[in-house]
Amino acid sequence: VSPMKSLVAAALVAVGLPALAQSPREAKPAAAGREALAIPHEKYTLSNGLEVILSVDRKLPIVAVNVWYHVGAYHEQPGRTGFAHLFEHMMFQGSKHVADDVHISMLEQLGGTDLNGTTSFDRTNYFQTVPSNQLETALWLESDRMGFLLDALTLEKLNTQREVVKNERREGTETAPYGIAREKAWQALFPLPHPYHGDVIGSLKDLDAATLDDVKGFFRQWYAPSNSTLTIVGDIDVEKTKALVQKYFGTLPSTPKPALPKVAPVKLTKPVVIRHEERVARLPLLSVQWLTAPYLAEGDAVADVLATALATGKASRLYRRLVLEKQLAQSVSASQQSQGAQSVFSLNVVARPGVTTDTLLKEVDAVLDEVRRQGVTPEEIDRARTRYDTRMLAGLQAVGGMGGKADVLQSYNHFVGKPSYVEEDLARYEKVTPESVKQFTRDTLSNDARVILHAAPPDSGRAPTLPKERK
């Protein structure tokens, strides 16, 4: 999951279809505007391999401390899934020098905010924003769980968090509207043995089978300074901050950087149709999905623009046709879910009572055929750019939290190795044209290489029965 596209929404990873906000862009930002978006920073590496990114922002007397471990569900082995997400929970349970379950409460008592962790297919992150005079405490807490978590990890803690994760899956997938259906579609997009096949929570069978030694081995392999990046943004003195970083992180042992898995891209060679009997939601859902280019690769920005043109706002094509004009749908949505290895473009339509998903599919295909022939208008592209840029600007007002400056620096550093990549990112959207949208829809959103999910409750295709008139 690309965190840069989570400027207004945290990654929702439980069913493999995160609700990722699109990276904001402006229609035609002036050069001065682009320079204003650049984030001044310094990047360096400790002798043990820990990357450090520092950026000064003195608007408020606060500091964001953000740690990314470059490991997610993508890096897990068959039979050992869900470990990265499991550690998202375990990392708050205490370490050698920090008592059990006090990490968050300690920071809150000191005025900390935005305290959380998230897991995606591509990375795991932990973040907090603290008063600038509490920076040292935040660094101590982060360094202690990086270097000494296993000293306090017990089978009892593992079993407790294992049950928490099971309940999270039940709530997020098994009893959620369309949860099981969406999972089936995701698994059809990424068949085994692709590491994107499951959801980030992992297989409950794998979690049940995991031993304490299994879990500790995963931590030793991936949660080392050499596979981590520490970003600090806010009201800091750079030299004093460097000294604190060295004090708390510099003595952690160095280990070789783990090798990344080599996975061939998935290619769909025929349409896959899934018909699921929906037992939770009361209205039918049509979801059509395609495999697309990785985050920041050619085609990723075009997909963002098309998603906005199709289903964002009352003027969008699918909303206008299906909700307003033909009154066949309750809601429509579209997204480019950008990820490190391979992305997914999704169209989702919830039917009105009595309308079938087959009817919706015909209408969706008619709209796509129109785009394949004509592209979209320059005005639609401009609206998309403006929407993205507004969100980018909003995100960069904060130093911490999901989509704040620290997270933006981390995301670009993770995916392209350049923390301040804002100008280059913006430039991708400047290159989108009606012709490029038309070509993308023709070449990538093919009817012959997609997953079509029909999730419908029993008898949902029947026209609603009107109450009998009383005599």
List PLM regions with ranges.
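Short, polar/flexible loop-turn hinges at active-site or ligand-entry regions and domain interfaces
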Residues: 93-97, 147-156, 172, 376-377
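Bacterial N-terminal signal peptides that target proteins for export
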Residues: 1-8
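An aromatic/glycine/proline-enriched structural segment found at the starts
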Residues: 23-27, 150, 192, 224-225, ...
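Active-site recognition of the HExxH zinc-binding catalytic motif
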Residues: 81-93, 308
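Cleavable N-terminal signal peptides
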Residues: 8-9, 19
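M16 family metallopeptidases and their MPP-like homologs
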Residues: 53-55, 60-78, 82-86, 100-148, ...
